[in-house]
Structure formats: C-alpha cells, structure tokens
Amino acid sequence: MFHSPRRLCSALLQRDAPGLRRLPAPGLRRPLSPPAAVPRPASPRLLAAASAASGAARSCSRTVCSMGTGTSRLYSALAKTLNSSAASQHPEYLVSPDPEHLEPIDPKELLEECRAVLHTRPPRFQRDFVDLRTDCPSTHPPIRVMQWNILAQALGEGKDNFVQCPVEALKWEERKCLILEEILAYQPDILCLQEVDHYFDTFQPLLSRLGYQGTFFPKPWSPCLDVEHNNGPDGCALFFLQNRFKLVNSANIRLTAMTLKTNQVAIAQTLECKESGRQFCIAVTHLKARTGWERFRSAQGCDLLQNLQNITQGAKIPLIVCGDFNAEPTEEVYKHFASSSLNLNSAYKLLSADGQSEPPYTTWKIRTSGECRHTLDYIWYSKHALNVRSALDLLTEEQIGPNRLPSFNYPSDHLSLVCDFSFTEESDGLS
C-alpha cells in the first residue's frame, strides 16, 4: 500500500514533530512532465464514496451555468447547479450528520489510500514547524489552525490559466488526494478553507468521518458557475474537531462595500474548548481579487472588522481570523486589520528576523499575463489573549521549482499556513 515510503514518512512526522527551527528539508523540484504511467491500484475503499458522488456531479452538470445580470437568472443558475450536483442526490450532505450514526475513518488508513492514488507522483514537500515560544509551557494542548486557499477545481481547470502547469497535475481525483494528504499530515484542530467547490461530495463527508464539524458558505455569484462541467459554486468552509470544541454560535456574513452587498463572504464561529472551558472566535474569509479593487477590498475588510467587533463583544472574546485577503501588506485593508481596536497581529510576521515583516510570498504562479509572486494569505490573532507557539515554515523557491504552483507536488497556487496557538494567562478572564 505504501508505494512511496518517503511520502508516508514526511506526512506522519508533521503533527508531533518537536518545534525545531528549520530542520534540513529536501529541495524537491517539480518534474517537467508527468511520471511514466504505471498500473494504478484498485480504487481505495474510503475514497470510493466521494469519487462516486463527484462523478455523479460531473455527469449531471454538463452545461455552462450562465450567471447573467438579473436576480432571477442568478437564483435560477444557483438552483440549477445545486440540483444537478451531488448535494441533491445525497441530501445527507446538506447538513452535518450526527456523529453517533457515522462510521469513523482511521486517518492513517485514509492517508494510505491517498498515497495509493498518488503513487506515480513525486513525494510531498517537506516543511518544518518553527518554534516561537517565549513563555512557559501551557497546561493545555495548543490549538492548531490551518489556513488554505485550496484552488477551486473549476477555476484551476478553467479560468485561472496556469500555463506552466500540465493538465494532468490538475486532475481532481489525484489533486483532492494531495489536499487531503496535506490536511492529514498537519492534523489541524481547525481548518479554514477558501475556493471550496467540492464541499458536499468530498470534504464534508470525509472530514465529518474524521471527527470534524463543517460549515460552508458559497459565494452568491461564484465564477465557478460560468465554467462548463462545474461542481457548483465555490466558497469558504470552516471545520473544527468536535472532540475538542463545542459550537457556541455561528454567523455567515455576506460582506458589504459602500453599503452594497458583494460577492465575497465570511464565516465566524464562537467555539468553547471542552477541556478548559475557554471561548474564542474563529473566522474565515476570502476578499475580492485583482488589481484595481484595492478600495473595494478595504471596504470589505472594514465591514468584516465591524461584524467581528460585534461578535467578540468589543474584543472581549479572543479572535483568530484566517483568509485569502488578496492584498499585499502595503494595502489599506491590511493596515485596517493591523491597527484595529480588536488588537490583532499577523502570525506569520513572527517568522521574520525582526518579527515585523510578512513572508515574501504565500502564492506563486505563472499565468498567461506573467509570473505572480505575492503575500495574500494571513492568520490574524488577538495578541493580548493568544500566543503563537509555532508556525509552519513556507516552501523555498527551490522546492517550488521553476514552473511554480500548482504542480505535481502541490495541489494549489496558495501555500497552506499552519499555526499552534495557546491562551495567555492574562486571557483567563476574557473567555
């Protein structure tokens, strides 16, 4: 079953590896062409149900869902897409199933199955956690949070035009296994995702069996709906482990700009730690993309901050905000978050020598318009109430390779960000 021991070992070592600074990691270069074809193993058992649902969704959505300009056309397109997707054929996916009636999945077994599907691909990239602890050890286990724009399948194969990425590297049946492998490798307690267009037929059914409770909020006018053979709208998804947290309240937020409702969304949930009883708010968002929309993003960010101000009762509840902000640190929306009365700090600044500089990139791709290397993804946190105990280091340029992302090694054009948080002693009275 373990066709790539190197791939297996790199995955299993990630979760409980000690927080050492930048252990040596192999610089794996992306192949210029797909590996030679070899006979593929039989379809893995745990992935079979999701594969069947995904296939049903593709076979039923064979036309472009034209969005048009009218409200009636919008809702018609949404209804058509959802009715032809796996969600309508599997209504149990529309709500989180009762975990008592759900057969759990062994994470190691699912990891083995993903590895079997990926046996012709090069091993996954090695990344290491950087120890950022400056205080005494916490009495409670840290809260591991993963932020990741996983790249909507419809956009990856359609609109995004990754000219240096072979079509074979974007095949969903293999790319979804790369995504799952990344999640299984780092085992986050909380998972914040953007560009999710396979929630109902892949992530919700599989992650719920791994013990996660999930929430999905699609974009009202998802660009995925304009792509032929789409799997429905993309949106934000938030998952948390039910054995660690209890959901206190949840809000789906459609962001506004200049009082107008926009196409961008956010999810904000207040969770209670079952072990300590402490509460905190976790939010995920994905702001408007493209150059020229800086003021629009700024307005969306201000709206999100106002919503979070209300949800956290004026910063009384500790807050973590994950997102693809589509904004460099020089943009106004970044400055709004950095100077907010919510007292937020960006976790990945702590990896820099001075603790004040963002990474040089969180996304690196080549499109028809040219090469793009930007820092767009962030994990913000309440610096008065939370400590960052460790953060997952980013891939090096050598690891990413000359053809950039996505690739046979890595499933998205954005890198995942992973941080371990603990409560400060001063935050005892805040939750």
Swiss-Prot record:
Highest taxon listed in the record's lineage: Eukaryota
GO CC terms on record?
A: cytoplasm; mitochondrion; nucleoplasm; nucleus; P-body; perinuclear region of cytoplasm
- List its EC numbers: 3.1.3.108
Q: Which UniProt keywords apply?
A: Biological rhythms, Cytoplasm, Hydrolase, Magnesium, Metal-binding, Mitochondrion, Nucleus, Repressor, RNA-binding, Transit peptide
In chain numbering, the transit peptide falls at: 1-75
Q: Name one GO biological process term.
A: mRNA stabilization
Q: What is the effect of changing K219A?
A: Reduced catalytic activity
Swapping D160A leads to an effect described as: Lack of catalytic activity
Write out the coiled-coil annotation as residue ranges.
Answer: none
Which GO terms of the molecular function aspect are on file? 3'-5'-RNA exonuclease activity; metal ion binding; mRNA binding; NADP phosphatase activity; NADPH phosphatase activity; poly(A)-specific ribonuclease activity
* Main EC class the enzyme belongs to: hydrolase
| Gene3D superfamilies, per database record | Endonuclease/exonuclease/phosphatase
Q: Where does Mg(2+) bind?
A: E195
Name the InterPro entries on file: CCR4/nocturin_mRNA_transcr, Deadenylase_nocturnin, Endo/exonu/phosph_ase_sf, Endo/exonuclease/phosphatase
Q: Its catalytic activity?
A: NADP(+) + H2O = phosphate + NAD(+); NADPH + H2O = phosphate + NADH
Question: Could you tell me where the Low complexity compositional bias lies?
Answer: 20-31
PANTHER family in the record, alphabetically?
CARBON CATABOLITE REPRESSOR PROTEIN 4 (PTHR12121), NOCTURNIN (PTHR12121:SF45)
State the family it belongs to. Belongs to the CCR4/nocturin family.
Q: What does this protein do?
A: Phosphatase which catalyzes the conversion of NADP(+) to NAD(+) and of NADPH to NADH. Shows a small preference for NADPH over NADP(+). Represses translation and promotes degradation of target mRNA molecules. Plays an important role in post-transcriptional regulation of metabolic genes under circadian control. Exerts a rhythmic post-transcriptional control of genes necessary for metabolic functions including nutrient absorption, glucose/insulin sensitivity, lipid metabolism, adipogenesis, inflammation and osteogenesis.
Q: What is this protein called?
A: Nocturnin
| Gene this chain is encoded by | NOCT
